[in-house]
């Protein structure tokens, strides 16, 4: 990004070369370069976690592309992203549990993205998803199929996968992923987590001590927007 911006600055400077001395052009180049970097930095929200209006939130990004995460009132949040590497963010609870979750809103990915109940446990270290909608890529296609579970008016396919030396809540680690992927996409409704936890357990997919649990938007090498409210 830096080399591209400097090239753009140089091109801009060349246009006015006949009308300005060299010192003035250098000053203008530095000002434009620094201003552009500042504007780029303002467009990207840094990774963070915490509490917002009674709900726990988590936002993580690998720093690629531009992504803006905004906490709204109560359980609402929004995300705008463009040409990202990878990010995941949303609102919910800490710790997670076998609760019944209600949510609604809009989810508009252009490319690869997920709208899911997303959480972690430790001992064992597990990253889990109950995917309600997704973009161009079905996340379950990269895992091992285990079966189905019927819940909340829909059918979910169950998968498991292993991530090696990947980012986690305890740092870079190797861990297991559990997935329930809804066969009919939706962007609002009820998710009965107990149904998924019980179905996973029936396939030997056991959870540990719950960490956070959020209704998350995730984007991977894509662009898009979402606005979600958790109840």
UniProtKB/Swiss-Prot annotation:
SUPFAM superfamilies: Concanavalin A-like lectins/glucanases (SSF49899)
UniProt-recorded name of the protein: Probable endo-1,4-beta-xylanase A
Similarity comment: family membership: Belongs to the glycosyl hydrolase 11 (cellulase G) family.
Main location: secreted
UniProt keywords, alphabetically: Carbohydrate metabolism, Glycoprotein, Glycosidase, Hydrolase, Polysaccharide degradation, Secreted, Signal, Xylan degradation
Pathway, per record: Glycan degradation; xylan degradation
Biological function: Endo-1,4-beta-xylanase involved in the hydrolysis of xylan, a major structural heterogeneous polysaccharide found in plant biomass representing the second most abundant polysaccharide in the biosphere, after cellulose.
Limits of the GH11 domain: 43-231
GO biological process, one term: xylan catabolic process
């Amino acid at each position: 990004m830096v080399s591209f911006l400097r090239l753009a600055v140089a091109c801009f400077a060349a246009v006015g070369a006949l009308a300005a001395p060299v010192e003035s052009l250098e000053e203008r180049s530095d000002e434009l370069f620094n201003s552009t970097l500042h504007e780029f930095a303002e467009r990207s929200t840094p990774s963070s976690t915490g509490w917002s209006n009674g709900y726990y939130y988590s936002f993580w990004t690998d720093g690629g592309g531009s992504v803006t995460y905004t906490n709204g009132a109560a359980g609402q949040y929004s995300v705008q992203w463009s040409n990202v590497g990878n990010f995941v963010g949303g609102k919910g609870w800490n710790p997670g549990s076998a609760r019944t979750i209600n949510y609604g809103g809009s989810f508009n990915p252009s490319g690869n993205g997920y709208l899911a109940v997303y959480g972690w446990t430790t001992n064992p270290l597990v990253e889990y998803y109950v995917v309600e909608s997704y973009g161009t890529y079905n996340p379950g296609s990269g895992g091992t199929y285990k079966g189905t579970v019927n819940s909340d008016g829909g059918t979910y396919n169950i998968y498991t996968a292993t991530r090696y030396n990947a980012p986690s809540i305890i740092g870079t680690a190797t861990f297991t992923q559990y997935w329930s992927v809804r066969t009919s996409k939706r962007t609002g409704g009820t998710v009965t987590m107990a149904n998924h936890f019980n179905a996973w357990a029936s396939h030997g997919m056991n959870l540990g001590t719950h960490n956070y649990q959020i209704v998350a938007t995730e984007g991977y090498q894509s662009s898009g927007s979402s606005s979600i409210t958790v109840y």
